[in-house]
Amino acid sequence: MILYKYTADCSKLNLEQEDATKEGYEGLYPRRSDIAEWNSKFYTAYRTEKKFFIMISDIRKDKMTIVAELEMEVDPRECVDYIRKILPEMELLACEEITSDEFYKEMVRTERNNWTECYIRSMKEDLKLATEPEHSYYEPVAYQVSERIYTSQDMNRQKQSEQMQEIMASESFYEEMERIYAPENEKRFVGHPVHYLITAGDKAAADDMIDILIPALLENQRLLSGRAYDVQKMTHKAEREGNFDNIFSGAKGGTVILSLEGEKSTGRYATGNYDLAKALGNKLNEYGNSTLFIFVDISGNRSVSDDTIAEILSNADLIQIQECQGDLKRASAYLKGLAEKTEYHDYTIDELTQYLPKEKKLYSVSDIYNAYNRWYGRGLKTHIYKAYKEKDLIKIELKKKTDKPYLELQKMVGLSDVKKVTDEILAAAKMQKMRKQIGRAHV
């Protein structure tokens, strides 16, 4: 599913304004007019052929906004040709890809203008625009999902190479870029020969790699869409959510980024995480030809075992891209690039590098981001909230206890009933853990 927003010149359509002197929302064209008839024709075409869904959502000062949803198999030119067939005097000025949230907002605008005969909420379900999990007062959400748009605008091999140097790209990343730009590849989309596993110590470091990877794939026509869903904090209940599948079906032609983090599990099959991993493997098998999968493995935050990862990845060929390490010179250049994007300007290189790990001679991208975050936080006091400039944090000294709580309890005089209950609880917990490790149900 690919979502577009078109801006068009409609001055030749001879639409009459209610009052040429009105401004803002009051300057809208008549609520019930030819626009409703045109939208009716677009809707009829959708119900008949199911190729694309087109809707006029707004008109202001001779500028018309049109949104369209296309199946990935449909040539965008076919959609444009149909718009021109219904509106021959209209001239398209611009086209951009939008998120599903933006698309739905335009649908709501159309409904409020009374320019459509279809029920918007029903169309949202029909187009599978809903991707958010259900919310509960008693349980955390099953997953978090966000959406962003990538473009290949102004992207070329030279710019891509410069960006790779800036992020201290690893050898594995350079090798994959060589394959993506290889002249023997045909520049057309027929499916995904490989998917990706990105390993990094920090989500921001992984995003830096993704921000280069997806535009490069777009430039080489390895993707039809620059729209990407970013799914994080998945729990074992994610696969049971009705909207979870919409993420993968709605991303056809585009990308799904899946962070392998969430609930910690005990043992390989102990929790529903294995079932979730198996479900992700099935999604990869089902949608892998039409949707690009990028798995993100953040060191120390992974919620599934190596065996479970292997279960997911067995459903397709994957290229692993790892974060790289660089010396102090490269780390300083990376930090400077991050610092230049902030409001702080009066800083020195020494101030940027003082938070890098002292014991290391080579620094990972994650080390650099950790140093940057500490430097930026310090800068809030010295540049923005200056009243805190000379204020240091209070350091609280904690008294170390030599014994563990259980041993301290046993040393106490009396409390025989409390000690007995504690022993029973610990025994039950050990039994439950043993059952988890062999894959049996919880007690």
Language-model-derived ranges and their functions:
Residues Y347, V421, M434-I438:
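Structured alpha-helical bundle/scaffold domains in large eukaryotic membrane-trafficking regulators
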Residues I2-L380:
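ATP/nucleotide-binding catalytic cores
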